[in-house]
């Protein structure tokens, strides 16, 4: 599958869709109020090797989920982030250290560990950027360059990287200084083609939420009109919810293949693309667009190279070659710790692997082969999972029974205000019936949790791209649609949580962590051993 077909939360698209894509509230064909943070049930019921029979299936009892150990995994991952920006961006030294830590952890847990590496298109942020605006002093222009060090009385506003502005996916570089007096052209919501044409050779400034709705569409329009760079200001997404009355900028990706197509087969290396907060953007508007001020925009970014990303996997070979895989992405956006997206999911993968390691030590060889993987490259377009499925395609086509994806499987600590649901969806009707059955068991066994949290269940067994088809918003996508050249539809099950308004912002840290939601996540996973095997 080409990357322009990926509709992941990172590649596509609407700023206004970001929270909906992560909470999957638009996906549900059915929802059930049940006990506990559903990831528990989700993994229990979907990672199970499901088998539906005339007789009720005994799913067994639950194993103990170690919340303290899981929190330790979270802390370990966060400690590997960038020393200043805090993220574990794909292709960086931080992502490499993370993958090596994971690979070693799988080996320590008794799995056969393998560290896959792939060379993929990836942009890199090479140094601290600078974004400033300046109102010239009283003597600027009289033999003294406006906004130069000698311009007495100048007023310079320095915007804070990560808080006020964020570099966007596959941005190029820029080096505009005050002395160049680069013009910034107001593009409104992007619907007026004449404004785009007037911005040729200049910096375009677009207000998010308009008819040109995705980063890809914006960058394509900028290329078509030969803009020097592009600024997108957030005035419509999560305003007044996480930082005063401001609308915090978020990182979004762009489709690499669409940009190549628009630019004649090469990347626009000299076109920077950043997003700004509402408050910061309004300062820029006042000083530069509607005033006599100047802009400095220095973005040291490379977007035309391939970088190495990593996929560590731990495998325990069972009595059969039938394969169950559970995974989450270990990379984050470049400018945030990613405590929820997706450190929470990756740590849960580790805890499930640890529980199975303990179970195998006590009960012997499992019936099926178990594999745990984490993915690099997710935030920029599912690069790691796509490359892994491509490499392992024959084996996966023949043996994959089920892939389970854990991406932001977490409920915010303020669940009463922000939402208390966890979402489970799958693309197989039989698997869905087992999810329902295990959910009902969990509800009976955990009545207090049933009152506290809500679970949503969804079945998406339609064709690709259809409203009832499996969405491609995370790393499960290639496991569903890329087997045998798309001729075999793989089975997958996906878990999301709710309430992470800090998604893709610098504020995605442990201050919003709800450890209870992780503790309940996956302790029923072992039940796959209680269900007879069938061929997919």
Predicted regions and their residues:
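His/Asp/Glu-rich mid-to-C-terminal helical/loop segments that flank catalytic regions of hydrolases
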Residues: 499-536
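Secretory targeting signatures
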Residues: 1-56
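Extracellular/luminal Protease-associated
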Residues: 92, 100, 153-266, 270, ...
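Second-shell loop/turn segments in exported
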Residues: 57-65, 81-96, 112, 186-187, ...
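Soluble metallo-hydrolase cores and metallopeptidase-like ectodomains found primarily
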Residues: 168-194, 258-339, 362
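Noncatalytic luminal/extracellular "stalk/propeptide" segments of secretory-pathway proteins
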Residues: 72-203, 210
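Alpha-helical metal-binding/catalytic segments enriched in His/Glu/Asp
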Residues: 106, 208, 312, 323-382, ...
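Metal-dependent peptidase/peptidase-like ectodomains
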Residues: 281, 375-483, 490-495
């Amino acid at each position: 599958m080409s990357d322009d077909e990926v509709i992941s939360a990172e590649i596509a698209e609407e700023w206004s869709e970001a929270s909906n894509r992560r909470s999957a509230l638009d996906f549900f064909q059915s929802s059930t109020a049940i006990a506990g943070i559903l990831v528990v049930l989700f993994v229990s019921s979907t990672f199970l090797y499901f088998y539906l029979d005339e007789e009720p299936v005994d799913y067994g009892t639950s194993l103990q989920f170690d919340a303290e150990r899981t929190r330790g995994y979270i802390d370990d991952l966060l400690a590997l982030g960038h020393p200043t920006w805090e993220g574990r961006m794909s292709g960086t030294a931080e992502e490499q250290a993370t993958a090596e830590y994971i690979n070693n952890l799988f080996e320590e847990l008794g799995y056969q560990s393998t560290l896959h590496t792939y060379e993929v298109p990836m942009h890199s942020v090479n140094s601290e950027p600078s974004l400033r605006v300046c109102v010239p002093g009283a003597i600027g222009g009289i033999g003294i360059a406006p906004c130069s060090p000698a311009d007495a009385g100048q007023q310079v506003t320095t915007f804070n990287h990560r808080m006020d502005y964020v570099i966007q996916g596959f941005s190029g570089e820029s080096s505009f200084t005050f002395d160049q007096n680069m013009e910034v052209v107001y593009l409104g919501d992007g619907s007026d083609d004449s404004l785009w044409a007037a911005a040729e050779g200049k910096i375009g400034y677009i207000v998010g939420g308009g008819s040109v709705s995705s980063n890809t569409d914006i960058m394509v329009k900028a290329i078509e009109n030969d803009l020097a760079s592009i600024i997108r200001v957030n005035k419509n997404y999560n305003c007044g919810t996480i930082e005063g009355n401001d609308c915090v900028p978020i990182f979004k990706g762009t489709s690499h293949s669409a940009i190549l197509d628009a630019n004649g087969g090469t990347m626009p290396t000299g076109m920077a693309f950043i997003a700004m907060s509402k408050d910061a953007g309004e300062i820029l508007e006042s000083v530069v667009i509607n005033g006599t001020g100047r802009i400095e925009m220095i973005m040291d970014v490379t977007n035309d190279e391939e970088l190495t990303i990593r996929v560590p996997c731990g495998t325990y070979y069972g009595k059969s070659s039938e394969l169950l895989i559970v995974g989450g992405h270990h990379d984050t956006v470049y400018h945030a710790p990613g405590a929820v997206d997706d450190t929470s999911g990756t740590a849960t993968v580790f805890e499930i692997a640890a529980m199975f390691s303990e179970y195998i030590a006590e009960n012997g060889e499992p019936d099926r082969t178990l594999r745990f993987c984490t993915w690099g490259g997710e935030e920029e377009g599912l690069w790691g999972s796509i490359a892994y499925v491509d490499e392992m395609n024959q084996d996966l086509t023949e043996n994959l029974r089920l892939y389970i994806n854990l991406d932001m499987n977490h409920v915010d600590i303020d669940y009463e205000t922000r939402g208390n649901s966890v979402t489970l969806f799958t693309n197989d009707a039989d698997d869905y019936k087992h999810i329902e059955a295990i959910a009902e068991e969990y509800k009976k066994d955990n009545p207090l949790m049933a009152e506290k949290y809500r679970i949503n269940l969804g079945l998406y067994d339609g064709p690709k791209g259809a409203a009832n088809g499996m969405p491609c918003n995370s790393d499960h996508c290639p496991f569903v649609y890329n087997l045998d050249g798309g001729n075999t539809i793989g089975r997958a099950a996906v878990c999301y949580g709710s309430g992470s308004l800090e998604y893709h912002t610098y504020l995605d840290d442990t201050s919003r962590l709800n450890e209870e939601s992780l503790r309940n996540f996956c302790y029923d996973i072992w039940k796959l051993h209680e269900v007879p095997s069938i061929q997919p």
